Regions:
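Bacterial N-terminal signal peptides that target proteins for export
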Residues: 1-8
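N-terminal signal peptide c-region/cleavage motif recognized by signal peptidases
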Residues: 16-18
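Low-complexity, acidic/polar, glycine-enriched regions of mature
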Residues: 20-142
Length: 142
């Protein structure tokens, strides 16, 4: 009987370890997550801007060193700090938000150092054009 209890306890511990090593899914919190970008303005300054509406999911499996990221950005929510620049960037010369109200990113690979993600390869679709990009992970806390 004690061997059965030991086997049951061992199975429970293995199951607990397997559960803790399972992939972890994160929903992007749109009140605290902003896609940011910067651009050079006439060679005089670098403007830091953001999109105020971002949704998506992030999944990481640290044990398997895999993951996935899917993000949708509402391009009409661009925020440069200037209403005039916002309208200009939303226009047909740049984002053309009337025709393309969203941009998307879908990962193809996640690179890890130890148990932390450091880079995410994927495809960015902007104005109906998809191109490969690599996003650098600068901070990850679990």
């Amino acid at each position: 009987m004690s061997r059965l209890r030991l086997a049951t306890a061992a199975a429970a511990l293995l199951a607990a370890n397997a559960a803790s090593a399972a992939p972890v899914s994160y929903g992007i919190d749109p009140t605290h997550t902003f896609a940011r970008f910067s651009y050079n303005h006439l060679g005089l300054s670098t403007q830091l801007s953001r999109f105020d509406k971002t949704t998506g999911t992030v999944v990481f499996d640290k044990a398997a060193k895999t993951g996935s990221v899917e993000v949708t950005i509402d391009t009409t929510s661009v925020n440069t700090g200037s209403t005039v620049f916002n309208e200009h960037i939303q226009g047909p010369d740049f984002l053309d938000t009337a025709k393309f109200p969203t941009a998307t990113f879908k990962s193809t690979a996640v690179k890890f150092e130890g148990d932390k993600p450091v880079a995410i390869d994927g495809n960015l679709t902007l104005k109906g054009v998809t191109k490969p990009v690599t996003l650098k992970v600068t901070n990850f806390t679990n």
